Every structure is written in C-alpha cells, then in structure tokens.
Design a protein with these regions (language model features):
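Short, flexible helix/strand-to-coil boundary loops that buttress conserved ligand/catalytic motifs
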Residues: 42, 61, 177, 341, ...
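Conserved N-terminal helical subregion
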Residues: 2-6, 50-177, 181-196, 267, ...
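Conserved mid-domain beta->alpha element of the FAD-binding
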Residues: 8-28, 32, 164-165, 191, ...
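Short, solvent-exposed loop/turn segments at secondary-structure boundaries
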Residues: 41-45, 273, 340-343, 367
Length: 408
C-alpha cells in the first residue's frame, strides 16, 4: 500500500506522537479532538518521562522540535525518594527499578526527564495546525474491508484507511472496537496543585527540589507527592531563541503537590469534590493533612490558590483484543493505569511511535495493513497490560488501591 490515510481520534500525547511520526513519513493524517481548543481542560502539571517516552519523542519529532523539547525539560536526579511526614528520607529508589519496558535508549538521550505537560503537548502540536480539527467528538465509526468512516456529534464524517482511537479512558472507539474491555474505579482520589519554585525553596529539602519525585505516607495511607519542574530555559524564551515553527506559553519553575489516598478519606462524594473551587480544594488538602507536621502542611498552604484540581483515578482491566483490519487503539483508550509507577503517558507515546513505525512498513510495501495492526497490537497490549497490572499491584500495596477484578 503506497498511499495511506490515517484518522486519529484524540489529540493527547500518544495521538500527537503518532501524528508527528506520520508527518515525518509523509503519510496523510488527520486528527480529531473533542475539545474546542488545546486549553479547554486542565492539562495537568509535572510529567515524569522515562526512556519509553523520551525515545518516542526522539523518534517522532523533527530535530528542531526535539531540540526545543530538550531545552525545556528538566534532567532530575533519577530517584523516587520515600520520606516520612516530616520529609525525613527513609529510602531512595532508583527510577530505573520501575523504568522503561523498552530497555534501550539513543546515545546521548537522557533516560529520565521532568517536563511541564502543557509545554510538551504544545511542542507536539507544533506544525499540526493544518490537520487538527477541534470540536470534533467522535460518536461511532463504520468500517468495511477497504475503508473506515469516523462519525462525529456535529453530523460530519471523515473517511480513511485506518482509524486510531487515542481518545482516552472513556474512548468511544474502544466501546465499539473492544466492547468487552472494562475500566474500573481504583478507589483512589487526589488533589493536584502547584507552588512557585521560589516558595518551595524555603519549604523543602534539596533532595525534594532535585529528585524525580518524592512521596510521603501517613498511617492512614494518605500520601503527599512532590515533583519539581525546573526549566533549563523558560519555554517562551527557548521558543524565541530557537526559532521553531511556533510559540510556547511562558511558565515559571514550580513544584507539583499531590495529596491523595482512598476515596473514603475525603469524606465527600465525587460529584461534590468535582464541584469544589481551587481554593476549597486547597483548604480540603490541609484538613486531610491535619495530623501532619506544620512544616509539611505549609507546602500545600503556600500553593497557588488557583492551581488545585480534583482527580478520580480509574484503571483498565486487561483483556483479549480481537483483530481488526482498520481500527486500532493506543494509550489510555486501551491500557489506562493509575499513576503509581508514572508510566501512563510514557506508554501512550511509546504506542504512537511504535504504530508509526509499523505504518511506515506498510507504505514501503514491507507488510499489509492487517499484518501491521496485528503485530502492533500484540506488542502494545503485552507491555501495556503488564504495566497496568504492576501499577495496580503497587497501588494496592502502597495506598490501598482496589485490586483488579481478576485479582480480587
């Protein structure tokens, strides 16, 4: 097949990695995103990248954009540090202990980075303006042996040779493609916020400011997670200096602050928690930590009062994925996981780069599309579901996450 048109539902990190890969291969691609703009919803804050994610970005981006990514990514000390509620170190775990499932890196490419998620997404969006359609909520698709058509809530449709569901944990593509695939409540809830790094410098130790991530647990298994994002060059300045194809929003250095645990600890229903304002969530985080030392409670107390948001955590249940000739899935659409190992976004981007390589083989005549999808899905579900299970086991052990149904 010398010509191929790929439809991607979802403009998250995995779908954008795939799109960037396909542009480099000169494969026609169109992206459909349900949000009305890149900034419709909170994009989250710090993201830890391991060699899976970094390799995928390296393979997918053109050199100028990879240079911009590197210039705006923190290279932390590669440890996840376990501390007590007073932030005294109990042990430091090398990040590679739960790192890449790919096990290889390009020479000279770091194996661990802390990045600002919104900055990374903006870099991945660069150059996609002509193929990205916002406000397109996919409802279903129709496929036959020769093509697939994506149907949208606004009554429009798009036709291509392949549809990729990169549309997240509530994937409409997955509901039709793998209707027996299930997602379940992990039982874990969290409040995310951040504080300026200048404030954090007076509140936390050097290790907290330099390690990949730091986590404290109390007797109730309430946890406090802390992760720095220190830009080698501020994103907007890096973009102006390196003259890439687009601008980046300014963002100062910060420390992410996550307070989480079993949903019963929060004392409110999810609907009420979701309706709380940022300032109310900040106050709730302090009430949750009422038994913690005052010096540690000062960390969320000094957070930006407009930065706090609530997250419910769900996970996929590993299952058999039947073969399809022209519809596939990537990332959270098929193997969503709790963030206990920090692997979800890394694997979504790995999926995108892997699928891109297989589709490159299709247009070069090395294999047909059905073979490419079969090989991609076999590899992707093997490593993806393996990490889903490991993340659930770690969550159960550390914070009391619900076990996966097959393990209960």
């Amino acid at each position: 097949m010398s010509k191929l048109k790929v439809l991607i539902a979802g403009a998250g990190l995995g779908g954008l990695c795939l799109a960037q890969s396909l542009r480099r291969l000169d494969i026609e691609v169109e992206i459909f995103e349900r949000d009305k703009s890149p900034w419709d919803r909170p994009q989250g804050y710090r993201l830890h990248l391991d060699s899976d994610g970094i390799n995928a970005i390296h393979q997918s981006l053109p050199p100028d954009l990879y240079g911009l990514f590197d210039a705006t990514s923190m290279k932390p000390l590669s440890f996840t540090t376990i501390v007590d509620t007073a932030l005294a170190v109990k042990r430091r775990v090398p990040d590679d202990e739960h790192g890449s499932t790919q096990g290889n890196s390009f020479q000279g490419v770091p194996t661990h980075m802390n990045v600002n998620r919104a900055t990374l997404r903006q870099i991945l969006l660069t150059g996609m303006e002509d193929i990205l359609r916002f406000g397109k909520k996919l409802t279903h698709y129709e496929s036959d042996e020769g093509s697939v058509a994506a149907m949208f809530a606004d009554g429009t449709r798009a036709k291509g040779d392949l549809l990729v569901g990169a549309d997240g944990i509530r994937s409409a593509v997955r509901r039709q493609r793998v209707p027996h695939a299930d997602t379940v409540d992990s039982g874990i809830r969290a409040i995310y916020g951040r504080l300026p790094f200048s404030e954090a410098a007076t509140l936390v130790t050097d290790q907290v400011r330099s390690d990949t991530f730091t986590v404290a647990l109390d007797a109730h298994r309430l946890f406090l997670g802390l992760g720095p994002v220190v830009f080698p060059t501020r994103p907007d300045l890096a973009a102006s200096q390196m003259n890439p194809k687009g601008d980046l929003r300014p963002q100062d250095d910060y420390l992410v602050c996550i307070i989480g645990g079993r949903k019963e600890l929060f004392g409110l229903e999810d609907s009420r928690l979701s309706a709380l304002s940022s300032e109310e969530l900040q106050k709730l985080s302090l009430r949750l930590m009422k038994e913690w030392p005052a010096a540690t409670r000062a960390i969320p107390a000094h957070g930006d009062p407009n930065s706090f948001f609530f997250v419910e955590m769900y996970t996929s249940v590993p299952c058999e994925v039947p073969k399809s000739a022209n519809v596939t899935l990537l990332g959270d659409a098929i193997h969503a996981m709790t963030p206990t190992l920090g692997r979800g976004a890394n694997l979504a981007m790995r999926d995108g780069a892997l699928l891109g390589r297989h589709l490159g083989d299709v247009v070069r005549g090395r294999k047909n599309l059905a073979q490419a999808l079969s090989e991609y899905e076999t590899e992707m579900t093997t490593y993806g579901f393996d990490v889903v299970k490991k993340a659930a086991a770690m969550g159960l052990r550390m914070v009391g996450q619900n076990p996966l149904p097959s393990e209960s």
